[in-house]
A protein has these predicted regions:
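Short coil/turn linkers that connect adjacent helices within long alpha-helical scaffolds
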Residues: 9-17, 34, 49-57, 87-95, ...
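Positively charged, aromatic-enriched patches within helix-turn-helix-type DNA-binding elements
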Residues: 203, 207-237
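A short acidic, leucine-rich amphipathic alpha-helix
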Residues: 219-222, 299-304
Length: 357
């Protein structure tokens, strides 16, 4: 990267295209090494310069890098917009493969599994034309996401793993879904967000897991407040929180009182289910990003997660203490890695909204 920076600085005002090509090459290295901050504006300017001077191939490649960066940091609308403005026919086979992989990645994050399969088929064809074994392996790895459990369905006291296409089907059904991946209660196109109200979501999940049975007041107090002891103050607080929860979900379900506690009664739905993450891990989103096998800086993780670097650093320290991640390097050069977790895909652990309707 430093050599490319020096080369870019060495080109004079009349060599703007050469300078722009160096910026694009530097951005590609930064993307691979997960240095995601500060490259967006420079890359956009380089792409504009290349387009202005008729270098359509390198301009398209720069646009593809922009789309890949947006996908990595979870800005799916921008990634989709960049792809829409690119003509894959201008790209060589290797870059066409990358274009299709970005399209597949966006589709998976949006739970559009048919579109993801179509994009992966295009990626496979382009990879074969490119004749690069590593690229073919990347396409095969991306395709395995569709064949790997992405979530768990908890219903009637039992649970089973779900593939992405099954998650898509559950969300499109008339089931009342307590979505523990995005912390909402939903049925069809109606969504009640509870991410900022953890007590109410804890009640929702407990009632959803037990449906059609009820949940005792003592069990709800444990789930919602983390208290093993039950006294009159806890019972009074539970009544207040159940009232708030009842008001929030009224369009979708009733919350009925029973002799020993409360039960969920979906409106117009056949049954209630809970869509749970494939693993219960406090810092699951951090692990999901690291699971791509690349080494990430804490600043890049913070950018991708849309949170503060301090929050990410605390999560990394906790994961390192638990032996789930490893540190590489020191100071500003420090990077973090983890081994991919076998047995499930991390798509639903990433901070992207699920489809609303």
């Amino acid at each position: 990267k430093e050599l490319l920076r020096r080369a870019a600085r060495a080109f004079g005002p009349r060599e703007a295209v050469s300078r722009a090509r160096c910026v694009v090459a530097e951005a590609e290295i930064g993307l691979v090494s997960r240095e995601l901050g500060g490259t967006g504006k420079a890359l956009a300017a380089a792409r504009a310069m290349l387009e202005e001077h008729g270098d359509r191939v390198n301009a398209a490649h720069a646009g593809l890098l922009e789309a890949r960066r947006f996908l990595l940091i979870g800005r799916l609308d921008e990634a989709e917009g960049k792809l829409a403005g690119l003509d894959p026919a201008l790209l060589p086979p290797a870059s066409r493969t990358a274009h299709a992989l970005v399209a597949a990645g966006i589709a998976m994050r949006r739970l559009r599994t048919d579109a993801a399969r179509e994009a992966l088929a295009r990626a496979g064809r382009s990879a074969r034309l490119a004749g690069i074994p590593a690229l073919t392996a990347e396409v095969e790895s991306a395709a395995r996401v569709l064949c790997t459990p992405a979530a768990r369905l908890v219903a009637g006291g039992e649970e089973r793993p779900l593939l992405l296409e099954e998650v898509e089907a559950v969300l499109a059904s008339d089931l009342l879904v307590v979505d523990a991946c995005r912390f909402v209660v939903r049925q069809g196109g109606a969504v009640v967000p509870l991410a900022s109200r953890p007590v109410l979501f804890a009640l929702a999940r407990a009632l959803g897991e037990a449906w059609p049975a009820d949940v005792s007041r003592a069990a709800l107090i444990r789930r919602a407040f983390g208290s093993k002891l039950t006294d009159e103050s806890h019972r009074a607080r539970l009544r207040v929180e159940v009232g708030r929860f009842r008001a929030e979900v009224r369009p979708l379900a009733e919350v009925t009182a029973t002799e020993r506690g409360f039960a969920l009664a979906p409106r117009g739905a056949r049954e209630a289910v809970v869509l749970a993450r494939p693993i219960e891990e406090e810092h699951a989103a951090v692990l999901a990003l690291l699971a791509d096998g690349e080494s990430w800086s804490s600043s890049a993780l913070a950018l991708a997660l849309g949170t503060s670097q301090r929050t990410v650093q605390r999560a990394l320290d906790a994961l390192a203490t638990a032996g789930k991640v490893e540190r590489l390097g020191r100071g500003r050069a420090r990077r973090w890695i983890t081994a991919p977790v076998p047995g499930f895909t991390t798509t639903l652990l990433l901070p992207a909204p699920l489809p609303v309707g």
